[in-house]
Each structure stands twice: as structure tokens, then as C-alpha cells.
Design a protein with these regions (language model features):
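Acidic-glycine-rich active-site phosphate/pyrophosphate-binding loop
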Residues: 110-125, 203-214, 352-353, 387
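Short, P/G- and charge-enriched loop/turn segments at secondary-structure junctions
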Residues: 70-77, 199-200, 256-258
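Acidic/histidine-rich catalytic neighborhood of metal-dependent amide-processing enzymes
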Residues: 130, 138-210, 423, 427-428
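Metal-dependent amide/peptide-bond hydrolase catalytic core
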Residues: 1-9, 79, 203, 212-428
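Acidic/His- and Gly-rich active-site-bordering loop/insert found
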Residues: 2-130, 159
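A short glycine/serine-rich beta->alpha loop
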Residues: 127-136, 220-222, 403
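Short beta-strand segments
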Residues: 102-103, 167, 192-195, 214-216, ...
Length: 428
């Protein structure tokens, strides 16, 4: 059987298994796997891998093992149940190139339930879309990669290289799930992460810094509010100054060879605000959790220094904060940006797969991504070229999140053909 016959059989196998793939995806999306509650998802992945005969490594993550590694971000919540699950396929004939397939099972909070058309963890298929929290980001991609492997087997083939299928947590907040796989010793010739990229390869992505502003005020009864100091209002003063820093960084970004053409690639977001104890008391405290991006090549340490300098300068210009300076705490991501390069071989292999599914000459569309993915750990820490390509969808981190099912079918096909091309296959 020639290579074209193999391709056709794999494509047909994806189609034949697509209903089962959607059923598994729906079950996966139905698990509420917000931060700290990912265990049932990891249980499901472990069971799916064992059913398929993979060698399964399921371990609890020890933060002490990771805290000195490049890209580690502070963990602030209970991490005692944090787990990583890796399924390994070992070939009988080791003739191809090894591969890591990775997906994350953690999802972000859903927000007010009354703003969803359907309950976020009761996935619905309608008009060619699957709706639900995590349906797009990125549970459909994770299950799609698993069914891509299934399609190769269903086609009567088996890969001729080692494959690690990795389900990680913390992608949405620190990335230490992916970091834990590298600390554990998992390596390969390439990595592929099927995040929802709208059918484009991520060429360059920002890094992200999470930090918390801790502002103190002076509480008094509201009838004499002028004699107190309102910590919430003072926090807004700092936010306005950080918006100016955001503007400065976006001006700097115009000189970047990938992000120069992207409108507003650096996004500052005050995402959580807490403060005060009583509506009739001038608030004595306010905490603001913030996120800001940095470009590839920018130093995280230098960016941290600029953030601190910005906050300090704003405090000096404030009546109360000048004598009661706010604190800046690092509360999650301390992540560098990543540019995919030195990756000609896996990109050529994926280009063949892309051409077979999408048509054209194998020129894969690219994007500069104003968020981040776990690819950075593989590329920056261990020089493992890490490709990121996946389906289309909308409303990630918002209401009524969905993945487009036809795009998911195509990306599953492209993933399966890429595995076959990169790892090699032989008849069973």
C-alpha cells in the first residue's frame, strides 16, 4: 500500500469515527474542570488512554520540583490534588521521529449562569457547533488528537515512533502542568498542541505576567469621607497609570517583526477587583488582579521592573499613596513570549498534511497570537519545535463558547496525517 492509499484510509477513518469523537468530546466538556477541580477530567483521560493500550503515567505535581525552572509562575491555591497524565505509545519498529501531543483540561470560570443560553457544562450541539465551557478552549482539540491516533489504528496502520499524549492543567494560569511533563523527563523531536487557532499556525505569541495590586486606605465613617482615604478609588489611580504603560509598550511593539502589523498586541487587563468591608465605610483595602502581555524577546524581569516603577511613580503622585505605597505581588504567569523557529522539518511534515486536507500547496496560514500557549516551554526550555494549530470557534473565556464542528473534523484529519508523516507508519 502506497502513501496516498494510507492517507485516504486515515481520512476515511476520521470520518467514520467522528460521531464517537463528538460523543467523547461532549462527555469531556461536561466535566466542570475549573482551576483546582481538574481531577475528574484527568481520570477520564487516563481511562481513555488505558482502554487504548497506552502506558499511562499519572502523578501528583510537586511545586517544589518546579519552582526553580524557567517559566515557573507562583501557585496561590491548594495544589494538593494537581495531577498530570501522560500516555505513551512505544513502537515495535522505531524508525520515525518522536512526538508530543498535548492538550490542557483546565477551563476558566463561567461567570453569571443567567448570561449563558445553555448551562456551560451541559454541552449542546446545534447548527454545526458544540457549545459549552471548554468546547473550544481546548477540550475538543485534546480529544481530537486522541481520535487522530485512533484513526491511524483504524486504517490498519501503526506509528513507527514514540508518542507521548499529555493532558495537563494550569494552562490558563501558570503553565506548570506542561512544565511538570518536562521536569518528569518527557522529550520528543517535536511537540504539537491543537489549541483553537482558526486553522492557522501560531508563528509568534506573547508572554503574560499576572500581578496583584494591594492598596491600603484609611477607613472612616462615610459622613466624614473627606478625612479618610478610599483604597478603591486609589486603585483606579494606579490602573490609569498602568494603562499608560500599556500604551507605551504597544508603541514599542510596532517595531516587532511579527506584532508590528497587529493592532494593540499588548493588552493590560484588570481582571478581578476586591475591596472594602461596608458600604458606609470608606474602604481600607483594595486588591486588583491584573494581566499584561510582553512580546517575544522581552525580558520578564525587566517588564516586572517597569510595572513596579509605574506603580511607584503613580503612588508618589497621590495624596495618600505617597506615604502609604501599594504593594505589587506576582500572582501567576511569569511567561516569556515564544516565536516558532528552527522548525523546518515538522512544519514541512505538517504542510503536507495541511495540503491534503485543506488544499493548496501546503502553505499554512500563520498568525501572531496576542495570548499565550504552552508551546513556549518546549521551545524555550528545551529547543523542541512546538507547533500550535487547531479548530475554529468563538467566545473563549466568554459566554456561549463554541467550537465549529466542521473545522474540528478538518483539524483532526490534519493532525492524523501529520502524525503519520512525522512519526512514520507501517502496516499492522
Amino acid at each position: 500500500m502506497n502513501a496516498n492509499d494510507n492517507k485516504q484510509k486515515i481520512l476515511e477513518a476520521v470520518d467514520a469515527g467522528f460521531d464517537a469523537q463528538l460523543a467523547t468530546t461532549r462527555d469531556f466538556v461536561a466535566i466542570p474542570s475549573t482551576r483546582g477541580a481538574e481531577g475528574p477530567c484527568q481520570d477520564m483521560i487516563g481511562d481513555l488512554l488505558r482502554e487504548r493500550g497506552y502506558e499511562v503515567d499519572d502523578w501528583h505535581i510537586d511545586v517544589e520540583d518546579l519552582k526553580d525552572l524557567r517559566g515557573f509562575g507562583p501557585i496561590e491555591h491548594d495544589f494538593s490534588r494537581a495531577r498530570t497524565v501522560v500516555g505513551t505509545y512505544r513502537p515495535q519498529n522505531n524508525a520515525g521521529k518522536s512526538l508530543i501531543l498535548q492538550g490542557h483540561c483546565d477551563v476558566v470560570p463561567v461567570g453569571p449562569l443567567d448570561m449563558w443560553e445553555n448551562p456551560p457544562f451541559s454541552p449542546v450541539i446545534k447548527d454545526g457547533r458544540m457549545y459549552g465551557r471548554g468546547a473550544c478552549d481546548m477540550k475538543s482539540g485534546t480529544i481530537g488528537a486522541l481520535y487522530a491516533l485512533d484513526a491511524i489504528k483504524a486504517a490498519g496502520l501503526r506509528p513507527t515512533a514514540r508518542i507521548h499524549f499529555q493532558s495537563v492543567i494550569e494552562e490558563e494560569s501558570t503553565g506548570v502542568g506542561a512544565l511538570s511533563t518536562l521536569q518528569r523527563g518527557y522529550r520528543a523531536d517535536a511537540c504539537f498542541i491543537p489549541e483553537p487557532t482558526n486553522g492557522k499556525m501560531i508563528r509568534s505569541q506573547v508572554g503574560v505576567i499576572w500581578f496583584r495590586l494591594k492598596v491600603r486606605g484609611f477607613p472612616v465613617h462615610v459622613f466624614e469621607a473627606g478625612s479618610g482615604a478610599n483604597a478603591i478609588m486609589a486603585a483606579y489611580h494606579l490602573i490609569h497609570s498602568l494603562q499608560k504603560l500599556e500604551a507605551e509598550w504597544n508603541e514599542r511593539a510596532q517595531r516587532d517583526h511579527h506584532f508590528g502589523a497587529v493592532e494593540h498586541p499588548i493588552n493590560f487587563n484588570p481582571g478581578i477587583i476586591k475591596g472594602g468591608d461596608w458600604a458606609s465605610s470608606v474602604p481600607a483595602w483594595c486588591d486588583v488582579d491584573c494581566r499584561i502581555a510582553v512580546l517575544p524577546g522581552w525580558s520578564v524581569a525587566d517588564a516586572q521592573s517597569e510595572i513596579i516603577a509605574c506603580v511607584s511613580a503613580a503612588a508618589r503622585d497621590h495624596r495618600f499613596l505617597s506615604n502609604n505605597p501599594p504593594q505589587v505581588e506576582w500572582s501567576g504567569f511569569l511567561s516569556e513570549g515564544y516565536e516558532l523557529k528552527d522548525s523546518a522539518a515538522p512544519e514541512a511534515a505538517f504542510g503536507k498534511a495541511f495540503a491534503a486536507v485543506y488544499g493548496g500547496g501546503g502553505a499554512v496560514p500563520e498568525r501572531a497570537f496576542t495570548a499565550l500557549t504552552d508551546t513556549r516551554f518546549y521551545g524555550l526550555n528545551y529547543n523542541i519545535p512546538s507547533l500550535c494549530f487547531g479548530a475554529s470557534g468563538e467566545a473563549m473565556h466568554g459566554f456561549n463558547e463554541y467550537v465549529d464542528l466542521e473545522s474540528l473534523r478538518k483539524t483532526t484529519k490534519a493532525t492524523a496525517l501529520f502524525i503519520a508523516e512525522w512519526c512514520g507508519v507501517e502496516q499492522v
